Amino acid sequence: MKIYRRAAITVALFALLSCTDEPHQGSTAVSEISAKVDTLDEKIKSAIVGYDWQLTLDHHRMAQKENSYTPPSIATIFSDPDVNSRILENNSQLIALDLPFKFLAYAEPGGNDAILAYTSAEFIASRHDLPASLLVEYSERLDSVLNLVENSTISEVETEQIGKDFAIVKIKSDFDFETTIERLKETINSLPDTIWFGELDYQNDAKKIGIELNPTRLLLFGAPEPGAKAMNSTPKLGLDAFCQKLLVFEDEGGAVWAAYND
């Protein structure tokens, strides 16, 4: 399907442009830094035990299963339906591409320290031209996690070059919402070496708290081997580039769109 092929090209380009022969530490050093990353990730998870929707992507260990290598890196994603819904209510559905909350515990190639990156409120505000007041609850949830780690551990995401709709590709579908979702899933699941991680139905979550949203759903999937090659020298790519996020939504006029990070 055209939409998925274009998203898959992004993975392929990362793989082609990344160094596949990047040297990495010996097994003892890797085990030691991996333990530090695990400990940092456990702190994140201890702060989100009350959230029903959670997803963990251990990029390092998924790469090992494919006989590939990327430095220790674990992405933790969790969803707060109240926060998501209030941000999306009466605002662009494209914001959902940067929701829900995502943290990445990782180490740089050859590094000895565990680092934490996350999708900040400032990033979302810049990319979607939102007032800071709309993201107060989002920031509060972030702080409840960030307060558990040392400031020196945190790697900030630069926002100076981020403008409205920065690096977002949007494609109009020829099909209705449910058919688009079905065709995308069929295509994704038919591809070798591609893993389906899950989906998040923003409309359904909003309905539970009395907020009306147009159909909006986030699909999560990835290919560990090319992902590992891309992240080999730049593991921080695991914050937004991997896994792949494909947002499908129906706008006010009834048109169906698919959007993803370029």
What are these regions (language model features)?
Residues 110-144, 247-262:
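A short, solvent-exposed beta-edge/loop patch
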Residues 3-10:
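Sec-dependent signal peptide recognition
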Residues 61-99, 197-198, 202-244:
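Compact, glycine-rich, soluble single-domain proteins
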Residues 135-178:
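Surface-exposed beta-loop interaction hotspot
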Residues 15-18:
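C-terminal motif of bacterial Sec signal peptides marking the signal peptidase cleavage site
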